[in-house]
């Protein structure tokens, strides 16, 4: 299948595929010089350099967005609607869609919110049934899983050069940033672990609130990031065995686990999310994070659904989320931004020392099928 200009050919996909390809209407917009030619099968999220954004790159991205907006908006107005499937909190997605509708009158945005498993199941069922339902899948894990099943249409943002994390097939609009967090009343600065790996030291036995590594949650993605970063199977196995040897209960909810650290039931959160930590620090809660330990970053994306009834509105929404206006809205609701040079309390550039290189989650199998990745790489060690 081929789609002109901004769309990438959808490759043959692995065993989850229903044997069909996502396709869009023939009147897809073209943005001159924004994207050159067609690309092959989409690669997964790739970390871009964390260097300072040049003024030219920022100006070019802003111009590309304005050109895209100018071309897409009239077509999106004719469509008149935008349907978002998301795992974001209701108050967050409402704030974002409300601002989008103010910016682009004539487009009515609605949303359906669920957890990732329910979202993926519904989207795949509707795709298989040929239903033109959702336009945008706004989530972390779901877009890559749906892409692997052939249920997404590849789209590369015209603002790619200003992104910290960029996937050439699915626009990355935010990030999950994991911070090594602790209760300042439960552990002394001199006793803190200085890295994620150091948490597995036996001296922290009984002190760590540990996310369940087998639930495909934040700790699972952290393990995937470290496996890629280290490229050392023996070291990776020692890390997992060390975490298991801490002999603490595992938790199914990162937010609930973080509340236990706040309450002082544990000294260290493995892990916590940076935006939650900074929010609590602002309230005077006795928590902080280890700045020497590079954050783990995971893409939050706005992917174009393969049966999108309003594809122009979907592309416009994705581009707007990445724009300076969209990132400002995302920041205002407490979510992490992904745009380089964007001033935010929760940006990597602001929250960590200059030159900090995050650990990105880029493992292809993990992004497309986290359960399979865990069964292969973690389960034999964790449950062995």
What are these regions (language model features)?
Residues 162-165, 175-176, 203-214, 239-244, 250-251, 321-344, ...:
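Periplasmic-binding protein-like
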Residues 179-186, 223-227, 298-313, 329-330:
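A bilobed periplasmic-binding-protein/Venus flytrap-type ligand-binding module shared by bacterial periplasmic
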């Amino acid at each position: 299948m081929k789609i002109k200009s901004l769309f990438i050919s959808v490759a043959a996909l692995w065993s989850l595929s229903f044997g069909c390809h996502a396709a869009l209407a023939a009147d897809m917009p073209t943005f001159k010089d924004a994207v050159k030619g067609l690309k092959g099968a989409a690669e997964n999220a790739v970390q871009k350099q964390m260097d300072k954004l040049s003024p030219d790159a920022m100006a070019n991205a802003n111009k590309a967005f304005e050109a895209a907006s100018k071309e897409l908006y009239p077509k999106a107005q004719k469509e008149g609607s935008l349907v978002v499937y998301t795992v974001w909190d209701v108050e967050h997605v409402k704030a974002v869609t409300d601002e989008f509708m103010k910016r682009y009158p004539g487009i009515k945005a609605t949303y359906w919110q669920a957890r990732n498993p329910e979202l993926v199941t519904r989207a795949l069922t509707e795709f298989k049934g040929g239903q033109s339902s959702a336009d945008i899948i706004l989530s972390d894990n779901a877009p890559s899983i749906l892409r692997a099943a052939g249920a997404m249409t590849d789209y590369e943002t015209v603002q790619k050069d200003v992104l910290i994390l960029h996937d050439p097939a699915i626009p990355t609009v935010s990030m999950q940033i994991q911070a090594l967090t602790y209760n300042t009343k439960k552990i002394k600065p001199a006793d803190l672990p200085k890295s994620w790996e150091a948490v597995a030291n036996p001296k922290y036995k009984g002190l760590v609130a540990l996310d369940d590594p087998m639930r495909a949650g934040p700790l699972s993605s952290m393990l995937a990031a470290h496996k890629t970063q280290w490229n050392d199977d023996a070291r990776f196995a020692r890390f997992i065995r060390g975490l298991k040897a801490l002999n603490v209960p595992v938790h199914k909810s990162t937010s609930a686990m973080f509340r236990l650290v706040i309450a002082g039931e544990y000294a260290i959160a493995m892990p916590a999310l940076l935006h939650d930590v900074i929010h609590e620090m602002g309230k005077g809660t006795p928590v902080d994070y280890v700045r020497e330990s590079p954050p783990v970053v995971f893409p939050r994306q706005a992917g174009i659904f393969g049966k999108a009834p309003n594809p122009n509105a979907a592309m416009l929404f994705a581009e707007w989320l990445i724009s300076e206006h969209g990132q400002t809205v995302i920041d205002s609701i407490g979510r992490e931004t992904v745009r380089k040079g964007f001033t935010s309390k929760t940006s990597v550039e602001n929250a960590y020392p200059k030159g900090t290189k995050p650990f990105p989650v880029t493992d292809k199998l993990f992004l497309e099928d986290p359960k399979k990745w865990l069964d292969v790489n973690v389960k034999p060690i964790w449950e062995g």
